[in-house]
Design a protein with these regions (language model features):
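Extracytoplasmic gate region of multi-pass secondary transporters
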Residues: 42, 229-280, 369, 373
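C-terminal transmembrane helical hairpin of 12-TM major facilitator-type secondary transporters
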Residues: 296-340
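Cytoplasmic helix-loop-helix junction between adjacent transmembrane helices
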Residues: 116-153
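Helix-breaking motifs and short loop linkers at transmembrane-helix boundaries and internal kinks
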Residues: 53, 85, 106-112, 140, ...
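Central cavity-lining transmembrane alpha-helices of secondary-active solute carriers
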Residues: 64-77, 273-285
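Helix-loop-helix hairpin linking two adjacent transmembrane segments in secondary transporters
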Residues: 151-194
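Conserved MFS/SLC helix-loop-helix module at the cytosolic interface between two early adjacent transmembrane helices
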Residues: 72-108, 293
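Cytosolic juxtamembrane N-terminal segment immediately preceding the first transmembrane helix
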Residues: 1-36, 41
Length: 424
């Protein structure tokens, strides 16, 4: 007698339970608002440089240190998430980065701003591993790739919101007021505290660790054990390529439009708003593809297509070529290439080290990604190359590396997340 898959008899959005939806929304809110607090800084680097009388390269270093601090925050959050649950580090991280951004808006000196933006990086890094593990462990296999794309693409929604705030409010509230808006995400903590539950797979895994006296006390070390280190190294390579690509495209884009081309705030905000809307929509579309053609190819294909697009618009000074090219890139190296990051990263590692592994591999990539803005600024300003050519070089190298790492990586489409003890 044939076994009927009852889950496929209902629409995919009805398959998840209420608790699964609540968990996913928590991760979505955390990531979207994380993006808002982080990307607002990309739009106000020039006025910060002017107000404090520091070189633009120094302001770009603030951006770099923020990214580097993400690794420390991520590893701490990953360890805490694997030990006590996904909810607690998620709440701490959201409250942390909200307060730091708000306080940075009162900066009396450049170094005050530097310190609190660096501390913001710690909280930012702590959000992603906790949120990704919470969402992906809670979600059914059938549509996990699609919802991974929607989740990761929500970074584009946060960037869209920060761009809209910049375009509409900058002239009236200035760069300080834009940083003060960063306190609003703190309200999400109330939602997570009262409505979100831990994923059952994590709860059962922790129960087994205790019952069998096989607790994994240092999950970071376990992902470098024999049999795991190759997977870990490939995941780090993958994320390094991806984040070098992302920050080559986006890190100094607004500054390029301001300094090299003299565009107004509204002209700068327009391509960023539309591109990030496309990032969100295309992430869902490529996520849908990931549930059918596999996680890797749903990222490799847009990654390869994005390289010639970069040559087309990055070297142009025509406003509409830049707008159209940047928006198209949002569907490729923006939303498409990153659509499967939450699902693919979490599916690669066992439950007892999932948050830690995701934290380390993803945010090791931010170390290299964080070098990109000051390097681009150095060549653009000190060598009078302008921003477009260094941005293009970083984009091409990063995208090619990203695709190679994915090609050699494992395929995880359809993989179930189980509470079995693998590393203990």
């Amino acid at each position: 007698m044939a076994v009927i898959d009852t889950a496929r008899l209902v629409p995919w959005w009805k398959e998840p339970t209420k608790d699964q939806w609540l968990a996913w929304v928590a991760a979505w809110l955390g990531w979207t608002l994380d993006s808002f607090d982080f990307t607002i800084f990309l739009l106000i680097m020039v006025p910060i440089s002017q107000e404090f009388g520091v070189p633009l390269t120094d302001v770009a270093v603030v951006f770099t240190i923020t990214l580097w601090m993400r690794l420390l925050g991520a590893v701490c959050s990953g360890w805490l998430g694997d030990r006590v649950g996904r909810r607690i580090p998620l709440m701490i991280s959201i409250l942390w980065y909200s307060l730091c951004n708000f306080i940075a808006g009162f900066a009396p000196t450049f170094w005050f701003l530097f310190v609190f933006r660096a501390l913001l990086g710690f909280g930012m890094g702590a959000e992603w591993p906790a949120g990704a593990a919470l969402a992906m462990e809670s979600w059914p296999i059938r549509s996990r790739g699609f919802m991974s794309g929607v989740l990761q693409g929500s970074w584009g929604i946060g960037f869209l919101l920060s761009s809209a705030a910049y375009g509409l409010l900058y002239t009236s509230i200035g760069w300080r007021g834009l940083l003060w808006l960063g306190i609003l995400p703190a309200l999400t903590v109330v939602y997570v505290r009262y409505f979100v539950k831990e994923p059952p797979v994590w709860v059962e895994n922790r129960r087994r660790q205790r019952a069998e006296n096989r607790e994994v006390r240092m999950p970071l070390f376990s992902i470098f054990k024999r049999g795991m280190i190759g997977n870990t190294a490939l995941a780090c390579w993958w994320m390094a390529g991806g984040l070098v690509t992302y920050y080559s495209i986006n890190g100094m884009f607004a500054t390029h439009l301001q300094k090299d081309l003299g565009f107004s705030p509204a002209m700068i905000a327009t391509p960023i708003i539309f591109a990030n809307l496309v990032v969100f929509l295309s992430s869902g579309a490529w996520g849908f593809a990931g549930d059918r053609i596999g996680r890797r190819w749903a990222m490799i294909i847009p990654g390869l297509l994005g390289i010639p697009v970069a040559f087309w618009y990055m070297l142009s000074d025509n406003y509409w070529v830049i707008v159209i090219g940047f928006v198209v890139q949002g569907a490729l190296l923006g939303g498409g290439a990153g659509s499967q990051v939450p699902s693919y990263m979490t599916e690669r590692f066992p439950t007892e080290a999932r948050a830690t592994a995701a934290a380390f591999c993803y945010h090791l990539g931010t170390i290299l990604g964080g070098i990109v803005p000051p390097v681009i600024t150095y060549f653009a300003v000190d060598h009078n190359l302008g921003f477009s050519r260094p941005m293009l070089v970083g984009c091409v190298i990063g995208a090619a590396s990203w695709c190679l790492a994915l090609f050699f990586g494992p395929e995880t489409k359809g993989k179930d997340m189980v509470p079995d003890l693998v590393l203990a």
